[in-house]
UniProtKB/Swiss-Prot annotation:
Glycosylation sites: 211, 215, 363
Pfam families per UniProt: XG_FTase
Organism: Arabidopsis thaliana
Subcellular location(s) per record: Golgi apparatus, Golgi stack membrane
Protein name as annotated: Probable fucosyltransferase 7
Alphabetical list of InterPro entries matching this protein: XG_FTase
Length: 526
C-alpha cells in the first residue's frame, strides 16, 4: 500500500514537472518569436504589414524568399503610402508578364521576329507582346538604379522586362513576379551579340537617328538604347515625346545604362500624367519600386539578419555611415576621416567628446543611450579610428557609441558572387538605420537611402585633399540623382535648363549645376 502511494505521488510529481517544463517552453518560444517579430521596432509592437500596404502580392512561397515577407519586421511602419493606382498597375503587369514571359507562346513568336527588319514589324496586331532587355554593366549600385529605371519604363509602356542573367543577378535577388521569370533565357537569339552593342552599333537608336535610317515606315525588329554616361545628343533623344512614339513601335529594346534616368521620364509630357497618378508623392518613386522589385536571396538575407541581430538590434539609435572615396588610390585619407567626425558631430548625429573632468558629471546626470554606428567602406581604417575615438574619449552626453563594419574588402570586385552579396547586404543594412550619412555621387548610398526612405546627410566632395566646410548637408529628397542627364529640353538645342521645366525636378545637392533629381517639396530652392 505504501509502495503504491509512493508510485502515485512520484507519477503526479513527474506529470507536474512535465507540464511546468512545457509551459516554460511555450513561454520561451513565444518570447523568442516576439523578439524576432519586434526586432528593429523599439517604439512599437504593432503587427507588421507583410504585404507593404498591398505593394506585394501574397502569391509566393515564403520559404523560397524569406526577405520578401520578413523585411517589414526590421523596419518601422512606412510613412509613405502606396497609391492604389500603382498597386493596380503592378497586378496588371504581373498578369502581362505571365502571359508574355519566357516559355510562353507569345515569347516564342516574338523571338522568331528578331532579325526580320525588312518586314513591317511595326504593324503587329493588338495583343502582341513587346520587350525591353536590361544588360548588366558597371557596379551593383548602378545596376540596381538602372534596373528600377528600366522597370518603370516597362510599366509605363506595357513592355516585358527581361534581365541578363549571365552575371550574378539570381544570386542577389529573388524573382519579383509570381508564376513566371524575369530572367532572359540563355538561348535568346541576340545573346551572343549584346556584349558588343555600343554607340556605333547599326541598330543603336542614336546612330540610326544620326544616319537617318529609322522613321515611322522603317521599323526595325530591335533597337539598342545606349543610355550610359558617354551617350551622345542623338542617344538622349530617346527621352523625348516625339521619339517615344517611334520607339514604341519596336518589338524589342535592348538597353545598357549606368544612370538613374527616371527624372527624364517625368519630363516627358506623354508619361507625366500617368506618373503623377502612380506616385502622388513624387520623391517616393525609387522607394516604392525598390521595395517591390529587390528582395535579397536567402543567402544575402541571412547576412543582413545575422548582422542586424548581433550588432544593431539592441541600440537605442542606429546611425549609418557610407564612405566612398573616388580616387585612383584605394587607401585611407585623413581628411575624409576629419570630415566624417566634423559632419556627425556638427549635425548632432554623434555626441562630441568631453574632457575627462566633465565625464563624471555627464555620466550621472542622464541615463546613457546606446548608439550603434554601421560603417560601410572598402577601407577598415575609418571604422577602426571612429571606434578608437569613442573608446578612448567620454562623450558630452554620456551616450555609449558602438561602431561596426560588416566587410573590409579593400577594393571593388564587381561580378564576384560573394563580394556582390556582401555589398547588397550592406546596402540593405544601411537602409535599416534611423539616420544616414552618405558620400556624394555614390550610387551605393543612393540605393540605401531610397530603399530605406531616408533623407541622408551627404558628405560633400573634398577639394585638393581638404575637408570641405561645411562638411556635409542634408538632402531634401530621398530620390537618387540622375548624374548625367540631358542638359537641354527636347524642343531646343540649347538654352533650356532641364531643372526648371517642372517644379518637381531639380538639381541634385551633390551635383548642383548638372544632376537631376525628383523632389516633392516645391518650396525648397537649390
Amino acid at each position: 500500500m505504501k509502495t503504491k502511494l509512493m508510485i502515485t505521488i512520484f507519477s503526479c510529481l513527474l506529470l507536474w514537472s512535465m507540464l511546468l517544463l512545457l509551459s516554460f517552453s511555450n513561454i520561451f518560444k513565444h518570447q523568442l518569436l516576439g523578439a524576432t517579430i519586434n526586432v528593429g521596432s523599439k517604439d512599437s509592437v504593432k503587427p507588421r504589414d507583410r504585404l507593404l500596404g498591398g505593394l506585394l502580392t501574397a502569391d509566393f512561397d515564403e520559404d523560397s524568399c524569406l526577405s520578401r515577407y520578413q523585411s517589414s519586421l526590421y523596419r518601422k511602419p512606412s510613412p509613405y503610402r502606396t497609391s492604389e493606382y500603382l498597386i493596380s498597375k503592378l497586378r496588371n503587369y504581373e498578369m502581362l508578364h505571365k502571359r508574355c514571359g519566357p516559355g510562353t507562346d507569345a515569347y516564342k513568336r516574338a523571338t522568331e521576329k528578331l532579325g526580320h527588319d525588312h518586314e513591317n514589324v511595326g504593324d503587329s496586331s493588338d495583343g502582341e507582346c513587346k520587350y525591353i532587355v536590361w544588360v548588366a554593366v558597371y557596379g551593383l549600385g548602378n545596376r540596381i538604379l538602372t534596373l528600377a529605371s528600366v522597370f518603370l519604363y516597362a510599366l509605363l509602356t506595357e513592355r516585358i522586362i527581361l534581365v541578363d542573367q549571365r552575371k550574378d543577378i539570381s544570386d542577389l535577388f529573388c524573382e519579383p513576379f509570381p508564376g513566371t521569370s524575369w530572367l532572359l533565357p540563355l538561348d535568346f537569339p541576340l545573346m551572343g551579340q549584346i556584349d558588343s552593342f555600343n554607340r556605333e552599333y547599326s541598330h543603336c537608336y542614336g546612330t540610326m537617328l544620326k544616319n537617318h535610317t529609322i522613321n515611322s515606315t522603317t521599323i526595325p525588329s530591335h533597337l539598342y538604347l545606349h543610355l550610359l554616361h558617354d551617350y551622345r545628343d542623338q542617344d538622349k533623344m530617346f527621352f523625348c515625346q516625339k521619339d517615344q512614339s517611334l520607339v514604341d513601335k519596336v518589338p524589342w529594346l535592348v538597353v545598357k545604362s549606368n544612370l538613374y534616368f527616371i527624372p527624364s521620364l517625368w519630363l516627358n509630357p506623354s508619361f507625366q500624367t500617368e506618373l503623377i497618378k502612380l506616385f502622388p508623392q513624387k520623391d517616393t518613386v525609387f522607394y516604392h519600386l525598390a521595395r517591390y522589385l529587390f528582395h535579397p536571396t536567402n543567402q544575402v538575407w541571412g547576412m543582413v539578419t545575422r548582422s542586424y541581430n548581433a550588432y544593431l538590434s539592441r541600440a537605442d539609435e542606429i546611425l549609418g555611415i557610407q564612405v566612398r572615396v573616388f580616387s585612383r588610390q584605394t587607401k585611407y585619407f585623413q581628411h575624409v576621416m576629419d570630415q566624417i567626425v566634423a559632419c556627425t558631430q556638427r549635425e548632432k548625429l554623434l555626441p562630441e567628446f568631453a574632457a575627462q573632468e566633465e565625464a563624471q558629471v555627464t555620466n550621472t546626470s542622464n541615463p546613457s543611450k546606446l548608439k550603434a554606428v554601421l560603417v560601410t567602406s572598402l577601407n577598415p581604417e575609418y571604422s577602426n579610428n571612429l571606434k578608437k575615438m569613442y573608446w578612448e574619449h567620454p562623450t558630452t552626453t554620456g551616450d555609449i557609441v558602438e561602431v561596426y563594419q560588416p566587410s573590409r574588402e579593400r577594393f571593388q570586385q564587381t561580378d564576384k558572387k560573394l563580394h556582390d552579396q556582401k555589398a547588397l547586404a550592406e546596402m540593405y543594412l544601411l537602409s535599416l538605420t534611423d539616420k544616414l550619412v552618405t558620400s556624394a555621387l555614390s550610387t551605393f548610398g543612393y540605393v540605401a537611402q531610397g530603399l530605406g526612405g531616408l533623407k541622408p546627410w551627404i558628405l560633400y566632395t573634398p577639394k585638393k585633399f581638404k575637408s570641405p566646410n561645411p562638411p556635409c548637408g542634408r538632402v531634401i529628397s530621398m530620390e537618387p540623382c540622375f548624374l548625367t542627364p540631358p542638359v537641354h529640353g527636347c524642343e531646343a538645342k540649347k538654352g533650356i535648363n532641364t531643372a526648371k521645366i517642372v517644379p518637381f525636378v531639380r538639381h541634385c545637392e551633390d551635383l548642383r549645376h548638372y544632376g537631376l533629381k525628383l523632389v516633392d517639396d516645391t518650396k525648397n530652392e537649390l
